[in-house]
From Swiss-Prot:
A single GO cellular-component term on record: mitochondrial inner membrane
Pfam families to which the protein is assigned, alphabetical: Mito_carr (PF00153)
Catalytic activity annotation: glycine(in) = glycine(out)
Protein name: Mitochondrial glycine transporter
InterPro entries in UniProt: Hem25/SLC25A38, Mit_carrier, Mitochondrial_sb/sol_carrier, Mt_carrier_dom_sf
Taxonomic source organism: Mycosarcoma maydis
Keywords: Membrane, Mitochondrion, Mitochondrion inner membrane, Repeat, Transmembrane, Transmembrane helix, Transport
Recorded family membership: Belongs to the mitochondrial carrier (TC 2.A.29) family. SLC25A38 subfamily.
PANTHER family according to UniProt: MITOCHONDRIAL GLYCINE TRANSPORTER (PTHR46181:SF3)
GO biological process, one term: glycine import into mitochondrion
Cell compartments where the protein resides: Mitochondrion inner membrane
Top-rank taxon: Eukaryota
Spans through the membrane: 41-66, 112-138, 170-195, 226-249, 270-296, 349-367
GO MF annotations, alphabetized: glycine transmembrane transporter activity
Length: 399
């Protein structure tokens, strides 16, 4: 992507795979040998699984933080309700953690891991595959404002992702993330209910029982509850993240030129640091929509109905007609949050989400890019060995 770095750095990121090694016969061409889809999906799934298992407690605690109101007021009136008060978010976080450990033991911090894995492993795999494919297509077709010229040579220590402009990174990241998010929305809703304390563990024992409960309460639409807020969070997040990730890689690689030999954009330290920085910055900019998404997915149906009556224009309709289907809009939920908890409600769980996203980005992209680099290096070595064997056989026949 376009940055203030040198032209040598701009030529560091090659199209979807590394196939320009000087050991290979096709090194003089500009067409990179593509990594097969199964390899991209496998490395994406592996990175997603590692992030899920290691970082699930962050997700659980974030959900519990975001589902609480700051003041003991009902959603639509000034009547007090019995909710604990905390002087700070730190006290709230400590109290929630102690309650979970006391009630369920330390394993309780990993509640919701199953739906998280079911969502994230295929989700991350599909996202990495989709964004890689979109970037490869855009790079090869040289689309104006999206693609950039691909150099005929590149270091073996460069990224395996195709090179696009800032606009291209924004668009491909957003399209891939929102598409995958829509496909996996039902599992996302189940995951939120597993992590929330607003739903009975008896009805949320398994994925199937939770899905039956959602279907009974809200119908098929219940599986996409909060998707608008999710899309408003994910589209800018993914676009900003991918653009920032590529910018950080290029700039960090440029800064490393003062070192002996420098570091390429595919170096694991550059990739990990870029993922961490990009994940943190993109999270800061999109966090309010994560709050709204969580509230939409973890608030009981009757409370959502009351919020909709109080803050949405549909409240003028007969409550008896809308009792089973009325849900607040994104704007209606935003007004409720502002009225019941003030602007600070839009910051709940920000620290946990930043820590989780930063760590997830560093882990995910490191495993993904390292896996792809390992695959291309293995293929290059195999091709070199085959070429050497063929040459020896030809020499033997000539003798």
């Amino acid at each position: 992507m376009a940055t203030a770095s040198s032209s040598d750095d701009a030529g560091a990121a090659m199209s979807i795979s590394i196939a320009n090694s000087s050991k290979r016969p096709i090194a003089t061409t500009k067409t990179a040998a593509s990594i097969p889809p199964y390899a991209t999906l496998a490395f994406g799934a592996l990175s997603g699984f590692a992030s899920c298992v290691l970082l699930q407690p962050f997700d659980l605690l974030k959900t519990r933080l975001q589902q609480l109101d700051h003041r003991p007021l009902s959603p639509v009136s000034n009547k007090s309700i019995s909710k604990p008060q905390y002087a700070s978010r730190t006290q709230k976080l400590v109290a929630i953690t102690k309650d979970i450990v006391h009630t369920h033991g330390y394993q309780g911090l990993w509640r919701g891991t199953a739906p998280t894995v079911i969502r994230n492993v295929p989700g991350v795999a599909l996202y990495f595959y989709s964004v890689s494919h979109l970037r490869s297509v855009a790079s090869q077709r040289q689309i104006p404002l999206i693609s950039v010229a691909i150099p005929s040579d590149a270091s073996s220590n460069t990224s395996t992702l195709a090179k696009l402009s800032t606009t291209g990174n924004l668009l491909t990241g957003a399209v891939a993330r929102v598409t995958v998010g829509f496909i996996l929305s039902p599992v996302t809703v189940v995951k939120a209910r597993f992590e929330s304390s607003n739903f009975s563990a008896a009805t949320e024992r398994t994925l199937l029982s939770s899905m039956r409960e959602i279907r009974a309460q809200s119908g098929f639409r219940g599986f996409f509850q909060g998707f608008t807020a999710t899309a408003l969070r994910d589209a800018p997040y993914a676009g900003l993240y991918l653009a920032l990730y590529e910018a950080c890689k290029t700039n960090l690689a440029g800064l490393s030129r003062s070192m002996d030999g420098g570091l390429g954009t595919g170096n694991w330290m550059v990739v990990s640091a870029s993922g961490l920085l990009a994940g943190t910055l993109a999270t800061l900019l999109t966090h309010p929509f994560d709050i709204i998404k969580t509230r939409m997915q973890t608030t009981p149906a009757d409370t959502l109905h009351q919020i909709a009556l109080a803050h949405d224009p549909k409240s003028t309709l007969s409550p008896s007609v809308l009792r089973d289907s009325l849900k607040p809009s994104v704007w209606g939920m935003t007004k409720h949050l502002w009225a019941s908890s003030g602007p600070r409600a839009l910051l709940d769980g920000l620290g946990l989400r930043c820590a989780r996203k930063a760590a997830s980005s560093a882990i995910g992209w490191s495993i993904f890019e390292r896996g792809r680099s390992w695959y291309t290096e293995r293929e290059a070595s195999s091709s070199a060995q085959e070429a050497g064997t063929g040459t020896r056989l030809l020499d033997h026949k000539q003798v």
